[in-house]
């Protein structure tokens, strides 16, 4: 008994409803995992846009510009939570002011610094040190985080020996 294959609404792959778990979304079908991932992404995006709206209040942000920026950053591999934490790092932790004309263009420049900052805060050793002996250990967080990336040379070296 074969059934007609359906196409997943989110990933575009075809699958059989009898074999794989699925969810019916309006008049279409989707893999259960794809649907759960879509719901999670939607919740993350909503949280990010709510935070941007909170940053810009009482002004209304330029959603056309911000939407294209967020889509571009998502295509570059950044997550919505990563963008949210980058904005929190830049505006709350560093104390910078919001410029209504710039949108969220600071994200690609501060993304790695914010990631390093939050991984340092969430480090289990740091958390354990805070709990056990906060008097004897001076736990300090530097404001600037230096990230060193190794880069391969662009040009090949020339060998003059024959």
Predicted segment positions?
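Cys/His-rich microdomains that often coordinate metals
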Residues: 12-16, 38
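Canonical RING-type zinc finger of E3 ubiquitin-protein ligases
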Residues: 16-24
């Amino acid at each position: 008994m074969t059934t007609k294959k359906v196409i997943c609404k989110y990933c575009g792959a075809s699958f059989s409803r009898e074999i794989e778990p699925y969810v019916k979304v309006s008049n279409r079908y989707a893999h259960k995992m794809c649907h759960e991932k879509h719901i999670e992404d939607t919740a993350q995006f909503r949280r990010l846009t709510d935070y941007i709206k909170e940053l810009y209040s009482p002004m209304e942000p330029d959603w056309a510009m911000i939407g294209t920026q967020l889509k571009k950053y998502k295509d570059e591999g950044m997550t919505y939570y990563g963008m949210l934490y980058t904005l929190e790092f830049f505006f709350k932790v560093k104390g910078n002011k919001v410029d209504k004309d710039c949108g969220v263009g600071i994200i690609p420049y501060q993304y790695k610094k914010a990631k390093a900052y939050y991984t340092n805060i969430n480090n289990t050793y740091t958390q354990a040190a805070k709990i056990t002996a906060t008097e004897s250990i001076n736990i300090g967080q530097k404001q600037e985080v230096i990230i060193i990336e190794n880069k391969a040379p662009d040009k090949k070296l020339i060998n003059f020996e024959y």
